[in-house]
Amino acid sequence: YGMVIRDWSSDVCSSDLVKGTIELIAWPDIREVVPGEPVVIKVALFNQKTGHKFPTGSVEDRIVWLHVEATDAAGTVYHLPVDRKGFEGEDLTIGADALAYQDMGIPLDLPDFPGVQRDGIPIGDRIFRMPYFDPQGRMTIQQWNTASFGVDYRIGPRETKIETFTFPIPDNATAGEMKITATLNYQKLMTPVAGFLEVPEEEAEVIVVNQYLTHVTVLP
């Protein structure tokens, strides 16, 4: 019913030692669906490799996100946004079209700096992070200007987080096997910030931590 399609749990040479850190498994609540019918995909993420929360290190710079998509029998790809859980600060754990990091204007002597894109990932993807806030309550990547912290939605050691994705099957979905792919990605530095600061490309390399494939059958 499902399979790990990328699993680096035994790869000791993987870059940044993050590949395989988190185990993934995904499954649908039903296996056969018709167009217009909703299917709920659950994804479990288990931190089996670290004795600390993931991501760790300079967590104000790091971003880890879960991307889920469905591909029908004709190859049409559909993006599945995560279901909200309703906890305080959740908005900052879901990919959005939003600006942040306005305090980068301080060292640049740009008092009206509007900021850059906060996430640089598909809108609706689940993010595992702990945001840092400047004295004005805006997200910051500058530790020296940090006044407070937001919700810590990182994955703790031996912790399992479960995310759900409710997906109404499109009316025009092609009948046959629909593949559901869950991918957990990691970046040391968010793409918009890396581009603004003109850092080397490898600093913003997207590393696939793990990936899991399952499927449903779309009936005619």
Locations of regions flagged by a protein language model:
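Single conserved hydrophobic/aromatic residue that forms the stacking wall/gate
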Residues: 1-8, 12
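Solvent-exposed, conformationally flexible loop/turn segments
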Residues: 35-38, 158-160
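Short amphipathic, basic-aromatic surface patches that mediate peripheral association
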Residues: 45-58
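Short acidic/polar inter-strand loop motif in beta-rich domains
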Residues: 50, 185-195
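Internal, hydrophobic beta-strand segments that form the core of beta-sheet-rich folds
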Residues: 64, 177-189
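Extended, solvent-exposed segments with strong compositional bias
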Residues: 91-163
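Short, surface-exposed loop/turn segments at beta-strand-coil junctions that are enriched for proline
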Residues: 168-174
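Short beta-strand elements
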Residues: 193-220
